[in-house]
From Swiss-Prot:
<feature type="transmembrane region" description="Helical">
    <location>
        <begin position="42"/>
        <end position="62"/>
    </location>
</feature>
<feature type="transmembrane region" description="Helical">
    <location>
        <begin position="5"/>
        <end position="25"/>
    </location>
</feature>
<keyword id="KW-0050">Antiport</keyword>
<keyword id="KW-1133">Transmembrane helix</keyword>
<feature type="transmembrane region" description="Helical">
    <location>
        <begin position="145"/>
        <end position="165"/>
    </location>
</feature>
<feature type="transmembrane region" description="Helical">
    <location>
        <begin position="327"/>
        <end position="347"/>
    </location>
</feature>
<keyword id="KW-0813">Transport</keyword>
<keyword id="KW-0472">Membrane</keyword>
<dbReference type="GO" id="GO:0005886">
    <property type="term" value="C:plasma membrane"/>
</dbReference>
<keyword id="KW-1003">Cell membrane</keyword>
<feature type="transmembrane region" description="Helical">
    <location>
        <begin position="169"/>
        <end position="189"/>
    </location>
</feature>
<feature type="transmembrane region" description="Helical">
    <location>
        <begin position="353"/>
        <end position="373"/>
    </location>
</feature>
<dbReference type="GO" id="GO:0006885">
    <property type="term" value="P:regulation of pH"/>
</dbReference>
<dbReference type="Pfam" id="PF06965">
    <property type="entry name" value="Na_H_antiport_1"/>
</dbReference>
<keyword id="KW-0997">Cell inner membrane</keyword>
<dbReference type="GO" id="GO:0015385">
    <property type="term" value="F:sodium:proton antiporter activity"/>
</dbReference>
<feature type="transmembrane region" description="Helical">
    <location>
        <begin position="88"/>
        <end position="108"/>
    </location>
</feature>
Length: 382
């Protein structure tokens, strides 16, 4: 029997609880919610800052660790040929939503919404994994396919945040990025010195990287993305995504093991700090984001996955047209990264709230995907 604490993490209960709490609080007591989240009540900084610029360092650090492990020999994205179809599907899952978002906005003709194109590009790994297990069963190859797609999707999402979404209020000061480069150099030196703990990498390399990004008015939450790949790891990866190898005691594996539970439960605070939008916030940006997530993701993944198969890069066993289409629909669940991008894409709080509502409404994929799975008679594999 699985422990209750593992069940809570597996079913994303902390994140969902944070989102529900934020929605209820922001609509019942908006002043009280705003005072807690946005007022500088914690040593001169707000809870929103502590969550989005400090806690999210760990979230993106864990994502970087999973991507690094997947790219190692024996990992799920290595050798490259094995990953071609999921990577093509990932590309479709990014390009599709962008094209849908920008095309619809061109028809609407609202240039103030253009910057939101990056919001629907990322997939919420944890929630998509949960829904995929309900639709396909835990043992279905479509679940592993979706996980590979979601991890690669997150890698592209990190790049989009770093390149296309600088601080909307303060101009970028590139000179400070030398500190980030210094952090990378420090991590490289530590690796050469065979430092056996991840702490020097995180504190020295990560600290320099965070300070450089913060001073440059970029997103310090990405600080560890540049450091984690330097953590020592075994020459081959023997576990699949989200699996732990108890024999792997490398700094990379220990970092993920030690901080994954902190991140999983800390996502309650992320949901609380970022999902507090009023129901009256629904607007044009809501429908742009929601349509781009559901239609763009599904069409993009279905198109590029089918193209990969036609080019000789096969889909996994038991993944045909209907399974691929359902995978695309499930990948349209954008929450964590989508909320983060919405918060940095728009300065206007009304537009930001409307865009966040679109990301939140994508959670409605769950009952739709389960129902379609039964209608299409998708065979579940426990």
């Amino acid at each position: 029997m699985r422990k209750p604490i593992n069940l809570l993490r597996e079913f994303s209960v902390p994140l969902i609880a944070g989102v529900i709490t934020a929605l209820a609080w922001a609509n019942l007591d908006p002043r009280g919610y705003d005072a807690l989240i946005h007022q500088p009540s914690f040593g001169g900084v707000s809870l929103h800052f502590l969550v989005n610029e400090l806690f999210m360092v760990l979230f993106f650090g864990i994502a970087a660790a999973e991507i690094t492990q997947s790219c190692l020999p024996g990992g799920d994205l290595n050798p490259p040929r094995k990953a071609v179809n999921p990577l093509l599907a990932t590309l479709g899952g990014v390009i599709g939503p962008v094209l849908v978002y920008l095309s619809l906005n061109a028809v609407i003709g609202d240039p103030t919404l253009t910057k939101g194109w990056g919001i629907p590009t990322a997939t919420d790994i944890a929630l998509a994994w949960l829904v995929a297990r309900l639709v396909f069963g835990a043992g279905h190859p479509a679940v592993s396919f979706l996980l590979l797609l979601a991890v690669a999707d997150d890698a592209i999402g990190l790049a989009i945040i770093a390149v296309f979404y600088p601080d909307p209020v303060h101009p970028t000061e590139p000179m400070w990025l030398f500190l980030t480069v210094a952090g990378i150099v420090a991590a490289y030196i530590l690796r050469g010195a065979r430092a056996k703990s991840y702490w020097p990498y995180v504190l020295v390399g990560g600290g320099l990287s965070w300070t450089g990004l913060f001073k440059a008015h970029l997103h310090p939450a990405l600080a560890l993305v540049f450091i984690i790949p330097f953590l020592p790891h075994p020459p081959r990866e023997s576990a699949h995504l989200f699996e732990e190898n108890p024999r792997d005691t490398s700094p990379l594996a220990r970092f993920e093991h030690d901080w994954k539970i902190v991140v999983d439960f800390g996502l309650f605070l992320f949901g609380l700090a970022n999902a507090g939008v009023r129901f009256s916030s629904v607007g044009t940006a809501t429908w742009l984001v929601l349509t781009a997530l559901l239609v763009g993701k599904t069409a993009g993944i279905l198109t590029m996955g089918s193209l990969g198969k036609a080019l000789g890069f096969p889909l996994p066993d038991r993944v045909g047209f209907k399974e691929l289409a359902l995978t695309g629909l499930v990948a349209g669940m954008g929450l964590t990264v989508a909320l983060f991008v919405a918060g940095v894409a728009f300065v206007d709080p009304d537009i930001e709230g409307a865009a966040k509502m679109g990301a939140l409404l994508s959670g409605g994929v769950l009952p739709v995907a389960v129902a379609l799975g039964r209608i299409l008679k998708v065979r579940r594999i426990p």
